[in-house]
Amino acid sequence: MSQVCLISGSPGCGKTNWILNTFKNYSGNCGYLRLGGYSEINLEQAINSKIDFAFLKDQIPNLLDLSISNSISEKDKENILIIIEFPQFFIPKSQGINGVDLRIINELEKYNLQPNRYLHFGRDPELSIKDTLDFREIESISLDLQKHIWDPASLNTFWFELVNGAYGDVYRAKALMNLPDGRYILFNWIVSQQGSQYQTLNQVAPLNGRPERCSEIVIQGKNLNFESIK
């Protein structure tokens, strides 16, 4: 029997880490889907980035991508854990499944998915509230960096400037970057934490030509200097 869990929360609250740990502790098949969420007045959602799936797939190679139609065979459906992630700024008004935004329910119909559990950071006690922030105003910039390669010195300088206000008041930044030696680095920063998180992923790109894998940056904050960042 499949388990379909829907999880939401504000940017940077810890959704992806919770999902990773949940998958690691599960012995059966695992499937993942990320939805884009919805912007509100003065609160702009980031585009539906591929960063989270690329990171999770690197850590769990057999993870199924549910954004691809017919990606689950009948055999895969046996005892599968499906987690659907989407960003949401506000705490749902109702508990459990009754609190799911109807727009999400309608969107899931095209994937033939119906959640039987719903958790939201800031509402449900089993989820950490350490980095669950109450955003009142937020802008978003997302850049596709596929085939871009960064030398480490330039990348470190850019990231330092970014999180220290050179391009506006950044509240949240997340990126997957390619290095010349084939390494794949996840950068993660949120204003509520001290310092950035860096993780070298398992995947190494061949050194012949530019890498085709996902490389993106998502920046959220206030008074962002779009032109300087681009």
Language-model segments: which ranges?
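Structural alpha-beta junctions
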Residues: 27-31, 50-58, 95-119, 165-169
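Serine/threonine-rich low-complexity intrinsically disordered regions
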Residues: 42, 52, 73, 98-101, ...
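Glutamate identity and glutamate-enriched acidic tracts
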Residues: 40, 44, 74, 78, ...
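Long, charge-dense, solvent-exposed interaction surfaces that engage phosphate-rich ligands
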Residues: 76-77, 86-136
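Nucleotide-state-sensitive switch-loop elements of NTP-binding domains
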Residues: 2-92
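Phenylalanine-focused residue identity feature
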Residues: 23, 53-55, 86-90, 121, ...
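P-loop NTP-binding site
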Residues: 2-18, 31-33, 126-230
